[in-house]
Structure formats: C-alpha cells, structure tokens
C-alpha cells in the first residue's frame, strides 16, 4: 500500500514539480498550478480529475475514490491510499493530475507524460 512518502517521492519526480505548504498540508504544483494535495491525516490524496470522470470513478469505486463536500464544485477527486493496488496505480493517478496542470510546453517537452496522441 502506498503511503505519504510514496506520494511525495512520486509527485516530486514529475518534471518541474514543487512542494508548497498550503492549508497546513503539503501541496504539489507544476508551473505554479496545484495538481495534488496530501491532507493532514495522510491516508488520502486529492488530485485533479475532470468532473464527469470524477463522478464516474466515485460511483464505480467508492472504496477508492470520493468527492469531498468542499471540493464538489471543482474538478478534484479524493483517493484513499490504502485502496490503491500499489505504486504503479499511484504513479498513474499523479501523472494524470500533473498532465491537467502542466503547460503545453511541458507536455511537449515530456511526451511520455504528455497527452495521448489524437486519433
């Protein structure tokens, strides 16, 4: 099961990522835009996720994903670390969120992390 140190290590391994404390918790940012937070209890993370996809995830896997009341109007979802299958799943979730916050220049510079090709 991934833990808070895995979140920090993986998030900071993504290009141009910085850590900044906000609301008394670690947040991870790319180009100044937040893409992940690690709430104080360190049992979950919040990540960017398009609202439609977020709603589907929360319905399909409520033991893993949920929408915090104070984040309902935003395109964010909570993820229970204990419910993840391992570091690979955590890495995929953090990379997906990073892509949503990264600049087009970063997406072009890191095609492995960039958006999937059209077609």
Give residue spans per PLM region.
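Charge-dense, helix-prone N-terminal extensions
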Residues: 1-119
